[in-house]
Amino acid sequence: MSLEALKRNGHNLELGEFEVAGQYGIPVLQPVHLNDRIDWIRFNHALKEENRDKYGVHFFIDDYLFERAWHDPSRYALFLRQFKAVMSPDFSMYSDFPKSVQIYNHWRKHQLAAFWQSVGITVIPTIGWVGHDSFEWCFDGEPIHSTVAVSSVGTQKSKESKALFLDGYNEMLKRIKPEKIVFFGDVPKECEGNIEHHAPYYETFTRELAFSALRR
């Protein structure tokens, strides 16, 4: 199958030939050193934002709200270049997904993020994991000593899910040694590192609705 055919089938292999890591050929992201705090808005809200140079864009939202960035990468790269920074897209890796789908979503997160970096976008790596067996590949392609982003949303509802989150978090600290962690959601007291906390998107959305109501 030709690259043109792969492009038509939506695999985006034509975006570039990037350095890769691990047995699954995950594109490698370059480290980013983010010293100043950035106000982050979710991708679907960013589409309507006029003051784009004041914000960063995150993807801690449902996949269907940002799949368009995968299906039309050049168009949305031009759009995202207008913001201060962008997080790598958080394609879902749910535990009930087949392992092949989990790895594919990790790969396309990096394929798109590496492309964004190649066109001059400041990309903060979003770190995610599934179960303990995902540790063998879920950190592939992530830079060492970089600012990174994580989200604890949905991981603190049971002892088991909280324990798994902490195990993955500690594995992240050990493997990629992030210099700063942009953290969305509740921060468990056990989490170490240089953490910059941000409220999850649903809390900021609630505040936005309340503010809009007051203005009426």
Segment roles from a protein language model:
Residues 1-32, 193-216:
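C-terminal accessory extensions appended to soluble enzyme cores
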Residues 53-55:
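Active-site gating/metal-coordination segments in enzymes
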Residues 44-51, 62, 69-213:
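Eukaryote-skewed repeat-based solenoidal scaffolds used as protein-protein interaction platforms
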Residues 18-46, 60-63:
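Aromatic- and Gly/Pro-rich donor/ligand-binding loops
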